[in-house]
Amino acid sequence: MKLGILGTGIIVKDLLSTINKLPIESVEILGTERSKEKTIELYKEYNMKAYHFDYDDLLKSDIDTVYVALPNHLHYEFAKRALENDKHVIIEKPITSNYSELKELIKIASERNLIILEAVNVHYLPAFKELKSSILEIGKPKIVSLNYSQYSSRYDSFKNGIILPAFDYKKSGGALMDLNVYNINFIVSLFGKPKEVQYMANIENKIDTSGILLMDYNEFKAVCIGAKDCKAP
């Protein structure tokens, strides 16, 4: 794999810390003028092949895969351009802001025989595979509950009127898209598509800072709790 990384955030640093354990031939990174210093710092620290501040330059290079680690609302736009340039795409969660965007990306990838996937690894963990294979042996569930709640480091700024992407509804922020998506992914991977879904959220300044998603599977219910305004016990 010849990998092109979009972004310089914490999640990118996490990936780069394990990059030498992966079958990756070369790495290039795309930053912005605003993150220029950080981009060059990462480029040097992890001995990358090149760094870029122009997406077209990166797409013209010999990379074969693009990893999209940008704010949620940018996933679709940058992934689409990568696919149209015949690059495989790995996208951080949530893969897109809505279903219509995802359908279009899948269509393009299928037409060009490319791979597109969301960077959620729970499906590949041995413990998850064991759980899925033995779920019927455990017995029929009645209530399945998952909780991913952590007090966001950006929440205090949000309360003071500083709206960062993680709390901006125009940029696909909020508890559902940022945290609860992990719970939903886990439940759907185990049990498939629910019959009915209901989301009840705590709304502050037009964004869900926390919420409960109820998934109805007829014979049992799944409850997904996600919060950025408080933490779980």
Residue map of PLM features:
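Beta-loop-alpha module in the N-terminal Rossmann-like domain of NAD(P)-dependent dehydrogenases
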Residues: 15, 46-106
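Predominantly a Rossmann-like dinucleotide-binding segment in NAD(P)-dependent oxidoreductases
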Residues: 125-195
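Short strand-turn motif at the edge of the Rossmann-like AdoMet-binding core
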Residues: 93-94, 119-122, 148
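Rossmann-fold dehydrogenase core element
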Residues: 104-121, 140-144
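Contiguous beta-strand/loop segments that form the cofactor/metal-binding neighborhood of enzyme cores
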Residues: 184-233
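Conserved acidic residues
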Residues: 27-29, 49, 64, 142
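N-terminal Rossmann-like dinucleotide-binding module
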Residues: 1-46
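Glycine-rich beta-alpha junction loops
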Residues: 35, 123-124, 147-153, 203-204, ...
